[in-house]
Amino acid sequence: ERLAALYPEYGLGKEDDGVAFRRARLSIRGTIYENIGFKAQYDFAVDSPGNDGGQFRDVYIELLELPFVDKARIGHFQEPFSLEEIPSNSYMTFMERSLANVFVPSFNTGLTVEKSMLSKRLHWTLGIFKTTDFWPSDNDSNEAAGYGVTGRITGVPWKAEDGDTFVHLGASFNRRNP
């Protein structure tokens, strides 16, 4: 589904440069009985130092159109934190995310519930996660032993009649317990 290569120039012993795949992803996604969604995505490329093989990115099941919330999702997926982290890199303007993004939790295992209100002008998501992405480092320490609560609320207080111009405001929080 997605393939991206890069030409890094770095010194690793006798190798001064090389070619590597930044991402080589294959995924499947769908809906069963109109109210059960699923996605499984595997990245075959080496993603970070210390990771010699691929890894799962998204593996989840979601229940749609629930009584008090729009959606409940369980599995391994991105925590609802930061407008810059959530969108796919396919929709990014720049090649890299900003430096501040290194402090954002990424893919972890958890459960979220979300709801849109006021004609989809207000949206909130709340979730509990088990830290599994070894953030902030890729060493073999006990950093992956904690749990976290993450929430995000976004709103569109003003929207032009053409629908293309609007003001988007949002806030998110994250509390980790190592």
Feature roles, as predicted:
Residues E1-F134, N139-P178:
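Outer membrane beta-barrel
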